[in-house]
């Protein structure tokens, strides 16, 4: 049976009693985002909206994004990526569990020097997919060209964020490319493997 969104007690400053609010809302108050599911349009809209709100509240204070995701929609992930670069706060990214596909892309997109992985995290890169291509021959050709364009652009961004040569990125993502936390650090996807949250907050 689904348990729904967990709720936690929270007392507003100056109030004598606590009130129960959703765990997500409590994390947002601490400027913490958690991507803990496949990335789709609904999740992206929520994450984008919260980032815009936190930017308006304090454009100088870091936003921390925890990632435990198998990946998901390219367009949804790119909406999050563009917003990360659109707003002023630094984005601290932390992999817990796994960051695969678009999850790994967003992990690497955090602010340089503030990208972390917990010790037993797994990171996986591969080439993007825009879904099954069907329809008339002309439609298939258009979709195939778009897939190649998106693939090229994502590889270029990964080359920028990791410091790896574009040619190496293109070779590595042709098949599922798995890395441990320490391997992801050596590759340039994260800057450091950490044990405690305070290590990320002190970056």
From Swiss-Prot:
NCBIfam families: PRK00277.1 (NF001368), PRK12553.1 (NF009205)
Entries under CDD domains matching the protein: S14_ClpP_2
Family: Belongs to the peptidase S14 family.
Keyword Hydrolase tagged: yes
Entry annotation: catalytic residues: 101 (nucleophile), 126
Gene3D superfamilies xrefs: 2-enoyl-CoA Hydratase, Chain A, domain 1
Enzyme Commission designation: 3.4.21.92
Single Gene Ontology BP annotation: protein quality control for misfolded or incompletely synthesized proteins
Record's catalysed reaction(s): Hydrolysis of proteins to small peptides in the presence of ATP and magnesium. alpha-casein is the usual test substrate. In the absence of ATP, only oligopeptides shorter than five residues are hydrolyzed (such as succinyl-Leu-Tyr-|-NHMec, and Leu-Tyr-Leu-|-Tyr-Trp, in which cleavage of the -Tyr-|-Leu- and -Tyr-|-Trp bonds also occurs)
The protein's role, per its UniProt record: Cleaves peptides in various proteins in a process that requires ATP hydrolysis. Has a chymotrypsin-like activity. Plays a major role in the degradation of misfolded proteins.
One GO location term (cellular component): endopeptidase Clp complex
UniProt KW keywords: Cytoplasm, Hydrolase, Protease, Serine protease
Stored HAMAP family: ClpP
Subunit comment: Fourteen ClpP subunits assemble into 2 heptameric rings which stack back to back to give a disk-like structure with a central cavity, resembling the structure of eukaryotic proteasomes.
UniProt-recorded Gene Ontology molecular function terms: ATP-dependent peptidase activity; ATPase binding; serine-type endopeptidase activity
InterPro entries found in the cross-reference section: ClpP, ClpP/crotonase-like_dom_sf, ClpP/TepA, ClpP_His_AS, ClpP_Ser_AS
Location in the cell: Cytoplasm
Pfam family, one: CLP_protease
UniProt-recorded name of the protein: ATP-dependent Clp protease proteolytic subunit 1
């Amino acid at each position: 049976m689904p348990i729904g969104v967990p709720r936690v007690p929270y007392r507003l400053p100056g109030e004598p009693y606590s009130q129960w609010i959703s765990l997500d809302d409590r994390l947002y108050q601490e400027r913490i985002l958690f991507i803990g599911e496949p990335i789709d349009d609904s999740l992206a809209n929520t994450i984008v909206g919260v980032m815009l709100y936190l930017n308006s509240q304090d454009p100088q204070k870091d936003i921390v994004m925890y990632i435990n995701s198998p990946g998901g929609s390219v367009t949804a992930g790119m909406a999050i990526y563009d917003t990360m670069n659109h707003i002023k706060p630094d984005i601290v990214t932390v992999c817990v569990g796994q960051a695969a596909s678009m999850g790994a892309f967003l992990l690497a997109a955090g602010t340089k020097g503030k990208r972390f992985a917990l010790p037993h995290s797994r990171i996986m890169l591969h080439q993007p997919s825009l879904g099954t291509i069907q329809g008339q021959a002309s439609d298939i050709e258009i979709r195939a060209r778009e897939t190649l364009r998106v693939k090229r652009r994502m590889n270029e961004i990964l080359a920028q964020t990791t410091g790896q040569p574009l040619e190496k990125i293109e070779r590595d993502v042709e098949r599922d490319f798995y890395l441990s936390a320490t391997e992801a650090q050596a590759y340039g996807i994260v800057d450091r493997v950490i044990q405690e949250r305070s290590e990320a907050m002190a970056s």
